[in-house]
Amino acid sequence: MSVNYMRLLCLMACCFSVCLAYRPSGNSYRSGGYGEYIKPVETAEAQAAALTNAAGAAASSAKLDGADWYALNRYGWEQGKPLLVKPYGPLDNLYAAALPPRAFVAEIDPVFKRNSYGGAYGERTVTLNTGSKLAVSAA
């Protein structure tokens, strides 16, 4: 995610929390005032949760984008379970946004890091570790 998308997401989260915090009462026969009491603690918690989720999605997307998808998919086929629906390409930013709230990609095994040389002619062979995996931890 670029900085502009992150700013837009934070602005939308703040506007959404303000809209939810101020709700006029629907019943005109009520003895209270026009609006209900706004609890600043709940509003601040909602804003913090939205910002944490956005930061988690950005961190997950950045870590997942640095993986060597060909080696990861080949490892899945060797184990008998294909890990990706498509045999090519990284998952987009929507995958990171679809993760559970406050979920982060904790660790990507170094064996699946993307090759800095591009992997064309003279690609080095990768010895895959049978214990290698993508780990996602929800807080």
From Swiss-Prot:
The record's subcellular location field reads: Secreted
Which cellular components does GO assign to this protein? egg chorion; extracellular region
Signal sequence region: 1-21
Q: Name one Pfam family in it.
A: Chorion_S16
Keywords (alphabetical) are: Secreted, Signal
Q: Which biological processes are named by the entry's GO terms?
A: chorion-containing eggshell formation; dorsal appendage formation
Query: Organism's domain of life?
Result: Eukaryota
- Of which family is this protein a member? Belongs to the chorion protein S16 family.
What job does this protein perform? Chorion membrane (egg shell) protein; plays a role in protecting the egg from the environment.
Tell me what this protein is called. Answer: Chorion protein S16
Q: Which organism is it from?
A: Drosophila virilis (Fruit fly)
